Amino acid sequence: VLGMACLTVQAAEPLTSLDKPEGRLDIIAWPGYIERGQTDKQYDWVSQFEKDTGCQVNVKTAATSDEMVSLMAKGGYDLVTASGDASLRLIMGKRVQPINTALIAGWGSLDPRIAKGAWFNVGGKVYGTPYQWGPNLLMYNTRVFPTPPDSWRVVFVKQDLPDGKTNQGRVQAYDGPIYIADAALFVKATQPQLGIEDPYQLTETQYNAVLKVLRDQQPLIHRYWHDATVQMNDFKNEGVAASSSWPYQANGLKAEGQPVATVFPKEGVTGWADTTMLHSEAKHPVCAYKWMNWSLTPKVQGDVAAWFGSLPVVPEGCKASALLGDKGCETNGYEQFNRIHFWKTPVAEGGKYVPYSRWTQDYIAIMGGR
């Protein structure tokens, strides 16, 4: 048993040098995060990497953080593009290993606002390489709202919208339990007496007030969304007027000439800062390090941001991609960093706060109308 314990500790020691690449790389990623030109041939940051390193890239897409965590538990993958609501679970569950940042040439070019993020720096160790970040915005139909809405109220409180029709059955909410934090920001602004400071650290009393807002919202919901493509279709063809969304959907719909726009509501927004994390039992660690390095090159950073509607973790990425253009970072919200409450896994901290396991249980019940 002792021998085994020593082995596991050693296995998690980061590499000190890179040998010959293993020829293969298996990545779990959000849809649209790793493109090889199959959707649109201009968007390809895989082919060149494969040519340069000989590492064949295989991508398994996942639509939610919970799905990523369960895929990582099954194993057989090298990397995952984990959001902050998954990263701590992966670290605590020992599914990912710390990395040696000295082996990542581009490390020094990281945005200092991201480099020290609490969602991947734990106990003096660095678990992974930042990839992209972005906000969860309020997307709305401009025909329904000639003047942009300035509050999340339009999706949380039953009301008539500016076109004179009710919002019932015309709004959406994200179907991940982490959406409880979006409701917490609304409660923080509208019920200040509850004293919510951090939407991911809710006491029992605060949490119950937030759940009430979500239960009241449930009859208004057209669909709880997680598939970006389905949400885009709902705005186009199903009469959805407002919802939380990613810049990805808004950019796609605008490109098709649809009447949509996005806004940062006055209550603030949640957001995600995603980290490429290395599986604790990765079979292709050299290819994984090569990918983490490649992922920080300014052009790759800019191209991903252009495609996904996200933001580069390397500031130079804002000026390195013809696809993103000079104004792309501004459009996607680069200056809004301080207004974003980035996703992180809610933890109990010795019983002070309601932990994520309860968020999951309760949100599933609420979505089911219970």
Regions found by a protein language model. Give the residues of each.
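Early extracytoplasmic/lumenal segment of secretory-pathway proteins
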Residues: 12-90
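Paired acidic/hydrophobic, glycine-rich loop segments that form the ligand-binding mouth/hinge
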Residues: 78-82, 224, 241-246, 261-262
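A bilobed periplasmic-binding-protein/Venus flytrap-type ligand-binding module shared by bacterial periplasmic
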Residues: 139-144, 185-188, 272-284, 303
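Mature extracytoplasmic/periplasmic domains
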Residues: 279-343
